[in-house]
């Protein structure tokens, strides 16, 4: 189980996207966090954990999802950790290349901020998006200096809404348990509602 290349669910490592439906890639970036770093190790950890399940039957389904979706592991986004100001553009360009090939993306992070450049790339391709966001925090806090569009893991959905990348009226944030003076028009199901509801009611 533990021998060989540690790709996601033992999918083939490649950057040839011919005939590919779904691309798994990592963005090992955590410089935007305001307290605990470490999520840069997330893509590697998820891949390592996934191989223990790669050989099993895909319970409870009676089908193998990889028979329906041609899936590859694209590796990680390339960027320079010493120049975080250039990282958003690098992540966006990484996503642009994958989306231009007609593939869907499953991205392993990384702190929450990586959602912003990924949303920018997807909005360019598909237009204004609807967002389903599971979190304890809304991540719609305004940047203290909007002129800089600072890299922060609590501002990305503020910019996503303000720049028209997502439609807040058709988006929902689930599980919030912190206050925010401005939720930017997102529909919110807070933690109390979630705890008192069934998954079917939430859906």
Language-model regions, residue ranges each:
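Conserved alpha-helical scaffold segments that buttress catalytic/binding sites
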Residues: 1-203
């Amino acid at each position: 189980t533990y021998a060989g290349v540690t790709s996601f669910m033992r999918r083939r490592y490649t950057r040839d996207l011919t005939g590919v439906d779904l691309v798994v890639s990592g963005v090992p970036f955590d410089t935007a966090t305001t307290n605990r770093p470490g999520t840069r190790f997330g893509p590697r950890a998820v891949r390592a954990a996934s191989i223990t399940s790669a050989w099993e039957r895909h319970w409870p389904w009676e089908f193998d999802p990889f028979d329906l979706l041609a899936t590859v592991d694209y590796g990680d986004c390339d960027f320079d950790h010493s120049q975080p100001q250039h990282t958003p553009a690098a992540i966006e360009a990484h996503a642009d290349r994958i989306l231009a090939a007609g593939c869907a993306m499953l991205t392993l992070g990384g702190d929450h901020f990586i959602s912003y450049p990924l949303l920018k790339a997807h909005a360019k391709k598909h237009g204004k998006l609807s967002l389903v966001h599971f979190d304890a925090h809304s991540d719609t806090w305004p940047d203290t200096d909007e002129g800089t569009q600072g890299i922060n893991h609590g501002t990305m959905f503020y910019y996503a809404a303000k720049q028209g990348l997502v439609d807040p009226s058709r988006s929902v944030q689930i599980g919030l348990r912190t206050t925010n003076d401005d939720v930017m028009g997102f529909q919110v199901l807070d933690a109390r509602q979630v705890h008192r509801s069934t998954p079917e009611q939430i859906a």
